[in-house]
Amino acid sequence: HFIYVIASDGDVQEGVTSEASSLAGTQQLGNLIVFWDDNGISIEDQTEIAFNEDVVARYAAYGWQTLEVTGEDVEGILDAVERAQAETSRPTFIRLSSVIAYPAPTKMDTGASHGAALGAEEITGIKQALDFPDEPFPVEDNVLSHTRSLIERGAQAHEQWQGLFDAWAEKNPENKALFDRLYSRELPAGFDAEVPSWDAGESLATRKASEATLQALGKTLPELWGGSADLAGSTNTIIKGSPSFGPEAISTRNFSAEPGGRNLHFGIREHGMVAILNGIALHGPTRPYGATFLQFSDYARGAVRLGALMQSDVYHVWTHDSIGLGEDGPTHQPVEHL
């Protein structure tokens, strides 16, 4: 299936977008399709005062397929979507050139329409410009019948999908049982039987204890996967014996990548890492984790907070949580956190 994103001018300015988009290009996520609503307006009006880069060229450099179409070209948009769906080895970035609040008499193409209601006078002017009747929310019968036909079309699509799913379930009873367990969010009996324990007073670095626990859980929970922001060797969060996630083309001398791998490599992208983990968790049904030093959780805090608000089932592993670990100096010591 496909993942669709509708992004604004502000969204493509955010640093976390660059982090995630760069990694998506590296991962060759061919089922990711982003629409950029390029109207050149933000809260402070025209974006040129702060943002004038070639966004399409940037996404091409990330390794994305890039397409451009005007926002009013319905057939062009459909064609762009079909081209995006046909591209399986690259994510697709579709630039939609549009005019915000078109055709509002005085607020069209202005920051005044970015985050506030247009008001009665502007709405009346829009209806006059479009030759719409001066009544609230007029919807013609042919529009209603067309949109309501989606109910029947959706029912037919679901029936077809259900038949395919039932046939798969009958042929794959073990995978069907796993599917049911994952979507019920249940843990298997004895999942923690091999989790080690230590006597009080025994000397062991907490990240080593965490590593041993992760290895034990990794054996019984196939849904557990994740990685770190370029700190796997320090946070001890590699699932041993499992390949890395990604296309085979990104394999290196140290890591063998394949689409079914369980070790994620986020690069030095803490904010992007946690935002991606939120998306994985909300999509379901797996259990993703991400690791970094406690000090560097600051870089990810925006996504950590959103994950808490959304109650996304993400596991954060924050190591080096002591000022006693000081080889790298105060930049790496979580003084304020503690």
State each model region's role.
Residues 1-2, 148-338:
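Thiamine diphosphate
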